[in-house]
Every structure is written in C-alpha cells, then in structure tokens.
Swiss-Prot record:
Bilayer topology: Multi-pass membrane protein
Record-given protein name: NAD(P)H-quinone oxidoreductase subunit 2 A, chloroplastic
EC number(s) on file: 7.1.1.-
One GO biological process term: photosynthesis, light reaction
Source organism (scientific name): Piper cenocladum
Keywords for the protein's UniProt record, in alphabetical order: Chloroplast, Membrane, NAD, NADP, Plastid, Plastoquinone, Quinone, Thylakoid, Translocase, Transmembrane, Transmembrane helix, Transport
Similarity comment: Belongs to the complex I subunit 2 family.
GO cellular component terms given for this protein: chloroplast thylakoid membrane
Function: NDH shuttles electrons from NAD(P)H:plastoquinone, via FMN and iron-sulfur (Fe-S) centers, to quinones in the photosynthetic chain and possibly in a chloroplast respiratory chain. The immediate electron acceptor for the enzyme in this species is believed to be plastoquinone. Couples the redox reaction to proton translocation, and thus conserves the redox energy in a proton gradient.
Annotated GO MF terms: NADH dehydrogenase (ubiquinone) activity; quinone binding
One protein family per Pfam: Ndh2_N
Gene giving rise to this polypeptide: ndhB1
Transmembrane segments: 24-44, 57-77, 99-119, 124-144, 149-169, 183-203, 229-249, 295-315, 323-343, 354-374, 395-415, 418-438, 484-504
C-alpha cells in the first residue's frame, strides 16, 4: 500500500515537471529557436545512426550542415528584434549575443566540411564526432545568451565536455591522450575556480544570480566596493582566463593543439575563444560595473603577457600546430583590447570585426595544414620547404592566410588590427596598443619565415616528405579545399570593403 502511494506521488511529480518544462518550451521556445534546430538535428543524427548502415554516411554530414545553416538563417531572421529575457531570467536575446552565436555557428559550419576527408582517412567514428561538434556548438550558443550565474556555468561545461572528448578522439595516439588529460585537468580546475568566484558574487549581492539583479543587490547591500567583490573578480578572471587561454593561463593550449586531431584543433581554436569572449564581456561589464578600473588593470596585464609571450615563443616552434597555438595566445591579447575599451569608442565593434576575420584566417590556415598532413603525414615546419614547386595552389593559400594573420595590407587581418588598435588608441590605451603594434611586427617575422620556406625551399632543405609529395589537381569534390577557398577569400576580399562589416558590428552594441 505504501509502495503504491509512493509510486503515484512519483508519477504526479514527474507529470508536473514535464508539464512545466513543456509550458516553458511552448511560451519561450521562440527565443531559442536556433538552438532548437540544433537539438532537432542531434536527434535526427542519433535516429539515422541507430537505424541505418554505413552507406548513409553522407546523410549524417548533410543533416549536420543543414541544421547549422538553418540555425544561422533563423538568427538572421531574428535580427534587429527588441532585446528579450526569457526562461525566468536565465536567457537573454539581443543583437550583441546573436552575433556571437552567428560566429560560433559559422565556425562549426566551416569545420564540418574541413573534417570529412580527414575522418574518412583516419577511420574515426563519424556519428560521434558530429554529435560532439553540434553539442559543443549548442553549449557555446547558450553561453552567449546566458543571463545568470548557473547558466554561465552549465553552458561552458557542455562545450568543455565535448571538447575533451574531441581532443582525445584518436584514442591510440599517445600525444592525443596526453593532451586530453592535461585539457581535462586544467578545465576541471578552471571550472572549480570560476564557481568559487561565483559564490563570492552570489553572497555579496544578497543571493542574486541574474547579472543585472546582482548589480542591484550589490547596491542594496552596499558591497560593491567590498573585499569580497575583489576576491570574486580575481577568481572569475582566472576561471575565464583558462577558457580564453591568455598568458599565463595558456599551459594547456600548445599540447592540445599538437596532440588533438587537426580538424578538432581548428574547431576549438575559434569557437572556444568566441564563446569565452562573449561571456567575458557580459560578466565584466555588468556585475563588475563598479570595479571597472580593477578588471581593466587585470585584463591589461593579461593582454600584455599574451601578446609578448605568445609571439616570442611562436618564433622558436618547429611544429605548425604548436606555432599556431602560441600565435592564438598572441591573438587573444589583441581581442582583450576590444574587451577593455568596451561599449565606448567602438571597442566591442572592433573586437567582433577582428574575430570575424580571425575565424577565416585561422580556419583557412588549418585547412591547409589538414590537406598537407593528409598528403604527407607530418606538420613539421621544415617539411613545408619547396611546397610551391609541388602544389602552388596550397602554397599560395597558406601564404595568404598567414600574411593575413600577420596583419599585412591589403588583407583582412591588417584592417581588423588597424580598427582594433585605433579604438584602443582613442580610449587612451597607448602602452597596450604600442605593445600590440610591436608584437604584430614580430609575428610578421615568423609568418614570413614559413612563407619563404614554402616558396623558395632549397634542394638541401627539401625533406623526403616533400620529395614524395604527389601533385594534386584542384578538385571540386574535395570538401577541405572548398572550406579552404572560402576562408582564403574571406581573409582577403573583406579587407577592401570594411565599412559594411564595421557598420553591422556597430549595430550589435547593447
């Protein structure tokens, strides 16, 4: 009899929870319609994989790419709508959040065709790879719109767990296992530090978790200048620092870049930075509104260390992927300038513009590395010597993307850095911008060193990998080359027509 009553209570409680969830989805589902498309795509992937054979592999790629494109389309249709807060204050929809969501979706859309041939050649499990990519994308999108501390913690964990699994996808590779272990340990530690910072913020504000309510709570409790807020700021900066990977929180980055599968590195190198930057701007700008001088100082130190250490250590690298790892550490230093400048002086607009260009430059470079790695089995820089004589198209594409990363005119990277540094200079960050300009010159050196090797490799420099390199024609059915061409075009042409891109970025300011 007692068991029967308990069973009835359990059914009633479960029904209430289900009805509440259905009610929330029914009345608030339109606010997360792009995310719902991805969830539907994930369900379709699972259904097809469990009911079909290996002959339906093209359908898996088609469903993944289509769901991402449809999600982008849904975002574009929602453009310029009034800002809305949904799900009891947990999620916010506005243009600023949506453009970061657009950038994450764009990264994932370009990374899937970049991965097709690599997965086929390495015989990796396809369905799980696509599931992890879409789930990580979903976590990044929720992080961009997160409006309370719980969602800000849960969403990046969704992204991070998939990232750990993707980085260790080649289970038989010792380097991949080592990279995954370091990534997992560092990620777990950073999440713990972040939550500890949130607990100080929660207590100081009188038990508030929504970002704007935290500000009101700090005013009511008169705790906005208390030591507790300073402690919260330090812990949260460290926690976010591990996600953004500026120096000195970059220890995991080179090993993960070198040991993980190259398409995974391409995906993580851009999506993680876009999602973390979106979260950082909201956390620093809203709850720490009264501590702007303190977090500006902390971020300036991180930016200077990142630009100096990242670019100087990149000079000494012999692996292309490790070189790009340290290059990305330097690049995040430039992005932090935009975060510091903030809403005034077009700081966020310059950061968004540079991130858009960085996505194309970085993914284009990784597409070249994937192609070269599949054809030679190496990513050592010296093995690229003389590539122009064997494959002019791949050599020219690599050179254009590297030059754009270095910031040489008239490529997109130059105008992106120019806009970012100009906004920083107008905001009075003279020392920070000067360091950025100096380190940009240093970065041009090691990029040009690789380009020189590509174009003019001497006979004594050419390795057996290059001597055995077979000429490959430009094939329209090669998805990696398609991604590479799109990224190369996006790394060059937008530099000539900057005004429309800047205007769109300026419209995203909240």
């Amino acid at each position: 009899m007692i068991w029967h009553v308990q069973n009835e209570n359990f059914i009633l409680d479960s029904t209430r929870i289900f009805m509440k969830a259905f009610h929330l989805l029914l009345f608030h589902g339109s606010f997360i319609f792009p995310e719902c498309i991805l969830i539907f795509g994930l369900i379709l992937l699972l259904m097809i994989d469990s009911t079909s054979d290996q002959k339906d592999i093209p359908w898996l790629y088609f469903i993944s790419s289509t769901s991402l494109v449809m999600s982008i389309t849904a975002l574009l249709f929602r453009w310029r709508e009034e800002p809305m807060i949904s799900f009891s204050g947990n999620f916010q929809t506005n243009n600023f959040n949506e453009i970061f969501q657009f950038l994450i979706l764009l990264c994932s859309t370009l990374c899937i065709p970049l991965s097709v041939e690599y997965i086929e050649c390495t015989e990796m499990a396809i369905t799980e790879f696509l599931l992890f990519v879409l789930t990580a994308t979903l976590g990044g999108m929720f992080l961009c719109g997160a409006n309370d501390l719980i969602t800000i913690f849960v969403a990046p964990e969704c992204f991070s767990l998939c990232s750990y699994l993707l980085s260790g996808y080649t289970k038989r590779d010792v380097r991949s296992n080592e990279a995954t272990t370091k990534y997992l340990l560092m990620g777990g530690a950073s999440s713990s530090i972040l939550v500890h910072g949130f607990s100080w913020l929660y207590g100081s504000s009188g038990g508030e978790i929504e970002l704007q309510e935290i500000v009101n709570g700090l005013i009511n409790t008169q705790m906005y200048n208390s030591p507790g807020i300073s402690i919260a700021l330090i812990f949260i900066t460290v926690g976010i620092g591990f996600k953004l990977s500026p120096a000195p929180f970059h220890q995991w980055t080179p090993d993960v870049y070198e040991g993980s599968p190259t398409p995974v590195v391409a995906f993580l190198s851009v999506t993680s930075k876009v999602a973390a930057s979106a979260s950082a701007t909201r956390i620093f700008d809203i709850p720490f509104y009264f501590s702007s001088n303190e977090w500006h100082l902390l971020l300036e130190i991180l930016a200077i260390l990142s630009m100096i250490l990242g670019n100087l250590i990149a000079i000494t690298q012999t692996s292309m992927k490790r070189m790009l790892a340290y290059s990305s550490i330097g690049q995040i230093g430039y992005v932090i300038i935009g975060i510091i400048v903030g809403d005034s002086n077009d700081g966020y607009a310059s950061m968004i513009t540079y991130m858009l260009f960085y996505i194309s430059m970085n993914l284009g470079t990784f597409a070249c590395i994937v192609l070269f790695g599949l054809r030679t089995g190496t990513d050592n820089i010296r093995d690229y010597a003389g590539l122009y004589t064997k494959d002019p198209f791949l050599a020219l594409s690599s050179a254009l993307c590297l030059l754009s990363l270095g910031g040489l005119p008239p490529l997109a990277g130059f105008f992106g850095k120019l806009y970012l540094f100009w906004c920083g200079w107008q905001a009075g960050l003279y020392f920070l911008v000067s360091i950025g300009l100096l380190m940009s010159v240093v970065s041009i050196y090691y990029y040009l060193k690789i380009i020189k090797l590509l174009m003019t490799g001497r006979n004594q420099e050419i390795t057996p990998h290059m001597r055995n390199y077979r000429r490959y024609p430009l094939r329209s059915n090669n998805s990696i080359e398609l991604s590479m061409i799109l990224c190369v075009i996006a790394s060059t042409i937008p530099g000539i027509s900057m005004n429309p891109i800047i205007a769109i970025a300026q419209d995203t300011l909240f």
